Amino acid sequence: LGEVQESRDGGMGNQLILNPYEMAFDVSYSRKLSDVFSMAVALRYIRSDMGASSDADMVPDNAFAADIAGYLEKYVILGNSECLWSFGFNVSNIGTKVSYDGGNTNQFLPTMLKVGTGLLYPIDDYNQIGIYVDLSKYLVPTEPIQEGTTPEDEAAYKEKHDEYNNMSPITGIFKSFGDSPNGFKGELEEIMASIGLEYNYNQQFFVRGGYYYENKYQGNRQYFSVGAGFRMSVFQLDAAYLISTVQSNPLDQTLR
C-alpha cells in the first residue's frame, strides 16, 4: 500500500514509518431466486499487517468476514414505454475485529451498507438513458472521545472505551445506527450519496456523468465525474474523469 508516516505525541514525538500490507482471499456464491431477484454471499479471509518494523508492539492480525447482497430487476411501464427498474443492496465486511497490539485494542472492520436504485428508459430501439442513485453508510460505531480532563471525565472515558473495545461486531453494526454525538442529524451526515446519468447507443457506446457527496466531517469527498465507455462482446472499457468541488481533494482532476 506504500509508505506512511505516523506522527505521535501531537507531532512532537518520533515519526513511525509504516509499510501496510493487506491481503484478502474470497469465495463467493450467487443464485437467482426468481425471475427478477437474485442474491449472493461471499466469505473472506483477511491478512492485515501495518508493517511497523521499528515498533515491536505492532503485530499482524487475521480476520474473517462475509458479504451479503441482493439484486432485483424488473420491467415497469412508464407512460407508453417499458422501462427497466433495478434495486440492489450490499452489506460488506461483516466479520471479526482486528488487533495490531496482540489483543489489547480491537478495531472494527469497515463494514458498509450500500443501497441503490436505477431506471433505464428507452428513447427508441437503439438509444437509452438511465438514472441511478446510490446511498452508503459505514456500519461501525462511533469511537468514544474524552470530553474533559477531570478524574471523573477520565474514568467515564475509560469505561466507554473498554465497552467499545469489547463490543462484538454484530452489536457494533446495530449501534452504528444511533450512536452519533450529534443525534439524528449526525447519523444523516454519515450517509454518502451519489447520482449518475448514463446514455447508451445500442448497448455498445456509453456517455456518463454524476456527482458524489460525502459530508465534510466524514471525509469531505465531493466531486463531479464525466466518463465514457465502449463494449464489444465480452470486452468492455470504461474511463471517468473526476472534478472536485472542494479544496485539497487528492481525487481532483484524476482519471479512473
Predicted feature locations:
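Subset of outer-membrane beta-barrel
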Residues: 1-256
